[in-house]
């Protein structure tokens, strides 16, 4: 695994390359790179692309440069509005996330943003999903899980139950003002909340084990639905139907 020194060297070199690239008019640290990373944090950097320059062309060139200089491997891309995020894996399993945005739209999308060079425009921060959205996704996933159990699609049922549990935990995070994204707030939940979800893990990949995990996940969702009381009240009866043994 990568060392802190290797990560710092990669960060400094990438920033050096960016500041020497006339196509990039601004750069910033984002995520944990901006707030103070721990031993295992990855690198998150974002850049503003000059007018008249094509973001795709710049991204392709930077990909080739990182592959040559760092032996980086391109894993996947994520697009959000005009920004493209490209995720790389370097030797030592160091993850490097680079994003590129046209200059006119370059700015902070969240609280973790430290400008290194150039200028940034003021933007509205992207808000976390609403509790109604989280609850609705969890309900959808629980219904799909029960259908998969009846179809004897056991691995797919496990997939939906696990996903529903994640949204139930995200609701618990939302209620306490914790981060709801990618499980980042889960470990900050009170221990009694986490303990109450222990039985939601699928213990055996058979009908009985899946139905038990489904029932426990449903209970966990309803127990943590304080922020969507009216919606939960409308759906509680239907959710309990999912837990009947007979199809």
PLM regions and their residue ranges:
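Metal-dependent nucleotidyltransferase catalytic core
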Residues: 1-22, 30-40, 47-98
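A short, charged helix-loop
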Residues: 104-133
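Short aromatic-enriched loop/helix-cap "lid" or pocket-rim segments at secondary-structure transitions
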Residues: 39-41, 109-111, 186
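Juxtamembrane helix-loop transition sites at the ends of transmembrane segments
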Residues: 63-65, 118, 173-174
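Short, positively charged
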Residues: 94-101, 107-109
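Conserved nucleotidyltransferase catalytic core and NTase-mimicking acidic/glycine-rich helix/loop elements
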Residues: 122-247
